[in-house]
Swiss-Prot record:
EC number annotated for this UniProt entry: 2.7.7.6
Originating gene: rpoZ
GO molecular function: DNA binding; DNA-directed RNA polymerase activity
Protein name as it appears in the record: DNA-directed RNA polymerase subunit omega
Function comment: Promotes RNA polymerase assembly. Latches the N- and C-terminal regions of the beta' subunit thereby facilitating its interaction with the beta and alpha subunits.
A single BP term in Gene Ontology: DNA-templated transcription
Reactions catalysed, as given in the entry: RNA(n) + a ribonucleoside 5'-triphosphate = RNA(n+1) + diphosphate
Family of this protein: Belongs to the RNA polymerase subunit omega family.
PANTHER family: DNA-DIRECTED RNA POLYMERASE SUBUNIT OMEGA (PTHR34476:SF1)
Keywords: DNA-directed RNA polymerase, Nucleotidyltransferase, Transcription, Transferase
One GO cellular component term: DNA-directed RNA polymerase complex
Enzyme class (EC, first level): transferase
SUPFAM superfamilies linked to this entry: RPB6/omega subunit-like
Known partners and oligomeric status: The RNAP catalytic core consists of 2 alpha, 1 beta, 1 beta' and 1 omega subunit. When a sigma factor is associated with the core the holoenzyme is formed, which can initiate transcription.
Length: 87
């Protein structure tokens, strides 16, 4: 298990702020069981696995955004259904 450095991660992310945001969201996905790791876990904590994935170029905002996309319903969908039944 090699150490992960910030410099390794910054090769795949624009700046440190984006690195922190990306790593924290990915670590939360791994910790809650929402997603499977793309690298062997090797008895690491979720934050370390997230940083290793970023350094390897396996995770970017496209991977994170897939979980954040939520199917949207119209704001007044329930009201519209009730009014259609009344007609």
């Amino acid at each position: 298990m090699a150490r992960v450095t910030v410099e390794d991660c910054l090769e795949n992310v624009d700046n440190r702020f984006e690195l922190v945001m990306l790593a924290s969201k990915r670590a939360r996905q791994l910790a809650t069981g929402g997603k499977e790791p793309r690298l062997p876990w090797e008895n690491d904590k979720p934050t370390v696995v997230a940083l290793r994935e970023i350094a390897a170029g396996l995770v970017d905002y496209n991977v994170i955004a897939q979980d954040e996309i939520v199917a949207e319903e119209p704001l007044f969908a329930a009201f519209e259904e009730d009014s259609n039944e009344a007609l």
